[in-house]
Amino acid sequence: MKLKTVSLLALSMAFPFSMPSLAQGPGSQEGWNLSVGGGLLFAPSYLGDDAYQLSAVPNIQVTYGDDFFASVRGGVGYNAIKKGVWRAGPIAAYDFGRDEDGGGPFVIAGDDTDDLDGLGDVDGTIEVGGFLEYDTRPLNARIEIRQGLNGHEGLIGELSMRTGARLVVADQPVVIRVGPDVTLVDDGYNDTFFGVDAGQSAASGLDAFDADGGLLSYGLGSTVVVPFNDHVAAVTFLSYRRLAGDAADSSLVEERGSPDQVTAGFFLSYTF
C-alpha cells in the first residue's frame, strides 16, 4: 500500500517549517543534523472526506547547515540563493498517491472508506520545482511551486505564512506559530483527485464531474513546539483547511465527503 496523499498534505500543514528551526535561532544549526521521531496524526481518510482516521506516522529530517534539507514531508531542497532574509532554490518531493480502498500502512484507528470504490488508484508522483522564502523571525512566508512528472502530472502552488513567539511557561520554553495556508492547482491535479469520468461514474455511482484547476484550499495552521533540551522536542498542531473551487464542488466531496478538513496531532522528535 501507499502512504495516502492526505497524510502528506496533513503533515505539510503541520510542519511547514522544520522543528529544529522552530526551537533554535538562526545560525545555530551547523554541519549535518539528523532528526528522527514520530507521533499521532488525526486526519480525514482522504482529502475531501468527512470521516477521520488516526495514524502513527514517522518523521525523519536531515539538514546541512542553512544549505540542504530533506524530510519525508518536505522532500529534498537546496538553498541555492541566500541573501539576507531571502532564501530560494530547487526542491523535489514525492506524492504517495491515493489508494482506492482508502487504507494506509500507518492507520491504527478508523475504518477504511469505500467512498473511492470505482475511482481507481492514483499512482505516486515525483514532483520537482522551486521555492522562495522570506524569513525575519518571527515572520516567515514561503511560496513553493512543483510540477508532477508522472502520476497526477499536475502543477501545485503552495503559499504559507507563519508568525509567532517564544514564551516561557512554568520555566519551560514554548514556541507558538500560527498563520494562513493557500494551495492552488492546475486542471491535471484537480481532475486526477476530484474528477469523475463516465467509466468511474458507472463504477462508483458518483455523478460524472470534470474538475478544473484553481484554488484548491485555504486555511489556518497552528503549531506549539516545546523543546525540552538541545535534542528533544514535542510538537502539537492543529489546522483547518476549506476546500474551494471545483474540489469543493466535485461529486466526490458533495455526495460523500466535506469541504471542511481538520488535522490534529502530536509528535516527538530527537535531533542528533
Predicted region positions:
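Cleavable N-terminal export/targeting peptides
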Residues: 1-30, 49, 247-250, 257
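Short glycine/proline- and aromatic-enriched beta-strand/turn motifs that initiate or cap beta-hairpins
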Residues: 22-76
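Outer-envelope beta-barrel architecture signal
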Residues: 28-36, 54-56, 66-68, 84-88, ...
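Residues on the lipid-exposed face of transmembrane beta-strands in outer-membrane beta-barrel proteins
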Residues: 38-40, 58-64, 76-80, 130-134, ...
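Outer-membrane pore/translocation modules
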Residues: 72-170, 175-177, 187-212, 243-247, ...
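C-terminal low-complexity, acidic/polar tails when present
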Residues: 209-228
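Predominantly the C-terminal beta-signal and adjacent terminal strand-loop region
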Residues: 227-272
